[in-house]
Design a protein with these regions (language model features):
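N-terminal secretory signal peptides and thylakoid transit peptides that target proteins
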Residues: 1-19
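C-terminal segment of N-terminal export signals and the immediately downstream linker at the start
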Residues: 23-57, 61
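Residue-level detector of Asp-centered blade-edge/turn motifs that repeat once per structural unit
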Residues: 89-92, 157-158, 215-216, 314-316, ...
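Beta-propeller blade signature
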Residues: 124-132, 179-190, 235-239, 338-344, ...
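Beta-propeller domains
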Residues: 266-350
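Loop/turn-rich, solvent-exposed surfaces of beta-rich toroidal or solenoidal domains
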Residues: 323-325, 362-400
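Conserved blade-ending motifs and adjacent loop-strand segments that build the rim/top face
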Residues: 356-370, 400-427
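Blade-level signature of beta-propeller repeat domains, shared across WD40, Kelch, NHL, RCC1
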Residues: 426-452
């Protein structure tokens, strides 16, 4: 394996960690053990006296919102389970955040069922909006979408709307629901009532995680988060009409699933830099009326599955997407603690860019990547959802992994500390502020400092 900054750091602690980088994330730092390592991120994380968020020197955070606090709109309380998120330019230096709430039927703090914004009054998930003034202070907070279920991640569109993803396949009549679930919903942050609560049914009914839109061709890429066999699929949606703004995805289109010939399970790929041609196979029944999509018959060539497909983000002329982990004990073909893939739509290939091997130390950054976004330096910023310590970590264009933030709020029991996952990492339009959620207890942070 090529020498990387991560393996050099591991060597100093006696921990064996298999990780490597290649491709769009830049040249490998490769050489002998005497080679001078590159600068690592922004430096070590400093303990937070408030025990909320550990950051490097020079960075500071502001708590924007916490679950259970009153919504400024008076519509109820801030919902629980803060997840995927995006930041939009609201003009005159203002920022508008759209934030998912991954609420199941057991959620203690539902998204209030506001008239005109509610799909299924018996579903507790949805989205909220936060308006920030030029100083970064919250001036408004209100419901943008309600009556949806398990709103996990999503993705922004080139026309500045948010696609919110339901990570469930529950049908009407299940768990008290009165509507089918497992859809993508479009939220217009400029006017949520204009987008309403309309499922984009042609984009498929499955356990959606995230989406990314090709701004040049209009193709929408989608990940499916399934941790039980058969695992999830990576999809593309070809809109029936050119995408011209909010609501245009309602015109329908064609859904395909990724096939990598000869690779039925992406976990078997353990060599960063490995590249494969891909095929796109029409999904027999996108509505999953009788059979979930991942169980459907894709013909003699089959289809390619991956355990826990998570974050998905457009950048570098293609789509970065994540497999959070793979476990042979759960049916995967091989073990890993995270993969980051890159799909090049022009060359019609996928390439493994980052691999966190099965020996990854759960107390170090790089265990079970989840939500991702592009960082100001052109690399990736990644949320963890693993065991042990929970980090937001960066992957630089030069291939370094570095800790950017660590969750310092202990939500465990006495003698059994536990830290909640991070979710929804995104940056302000000017790249000067990072926004991120601590999923539990449900805190939204704004992080400022010497970004580069």
């Amino acid at each position: 394996m090529s020498v990387t900054r991560r393996t050099l750091l591991a060597a100093g602690t006696g921990t064996g960690i298999a990780i490597a980088f290649t491709g769009a994330l830049g040249a490998l730092f490769a050489g002998s053990s005497h080679a001078a390592p590159p600068r690592q991120g922004y430096g070590p994380l400093l303990p937070d006296p408030r025990k909320l968020l550990d950051l490097p020197a020079g960075f500071r955070y502001r708590v924007l919102s916490r679950a259970g606090d009153p919504l400024r709109s008076g519509e109820g309380t801030v919902p629980a389970n803060c997840d995927g998120m995006a930041a939009f330019d609201a003009g005159s230096g203002r920022v508008r955040l759209v934030r998912n709430h991954e609420n199941r039927t057991t959620a203690a703090l539902r998204v209030p069922a506001v008239d005109g914004l509610t799909y299924d009054p018996h579903a507790l998930g949805g989205c909220t909006l936060l308006d920030l003034d030029p100083s970064g202070s919250v001036t408004a907070e209100r419901v943008a979408l309600a009556g949806t279920a398990v709103n996990c991640a999503g993705g922004r569109t080139p026309w500045n709307t948010w696609l919110s993803c339901e990570e469930t396949e529950d049908r009407a009549g299940t768990s008290g629901y009165t509507e089918d679930h497992g859809y993508v919903f479009e939220v217009d942050p400029a006017d949520p009532r204009r987008s309403g609560a309309v499922p984009l049914t042609a984009m498929g009914r499955f356990a959606h995680e995230a989406v990314a839109v090709d701004p040049y061709r209009g193709t929408v890429y989608e990940t499916e988060d399934a941790f039980i066999e058969p695992f999830g699929l990576f999809y593309r949606f070809l809109p029936a009409q050119p995408l011209r703004g909010p609501g245009s995805l309602r015109a329908g289109g064609t859904l395909h699933a990724l096939r990598v010939p000869g690779v039925p399970d992406l976990s078997v790929v353990q060599e960063p830099g490995a590249e494969f041609p891909v095929e796109w196979v029409p999904v027999p029944d996108p509505s999953a009326a009788g059979t979930p999509i991942r169980f459907q018959d894709f013909g003699p060539g089959g289809i390619t599955h991956a355990q826990k497909l998570e974050g998905c983000y457009w950048g570098d002329g293609g789509v970065h997407f994540v497999s959070s982990y793979a476990r042979t004990l759960e049916g995967a073909a091989a073990d890993h603690h995270g993969q980051v893939w890159f799909h090049d739509p022009v060359r019609s290939t996928i390439r493994l860019d980052v691999l966190f091997g099965p020996a990854a130390d759960i107390q170090l950054p790089g265990d079970s990547p989840d939500n991702i976004c592009l960082a100001p330096d052109g690399g990736l910023m990644v949320c963890e959802d693993g065991g042990g310590a929970q980090y937001v970590f960066g992957v630089t264009p030069g291939g370094e992994v570095y800790a950017m933030a660590r969750n310092a709020e202990d939500i465990g029991r006495p003698g059994a500390p536990e830290w909640g996952e991070f979710a929804g990492v995104t940056f302000s339009p000017d790249g000067r502020t990072m926004y991120v959620n601590a999923y539990t207890p449900g805190t939204t942070f704004a992080v400022t400092g010497p970004w580069r």
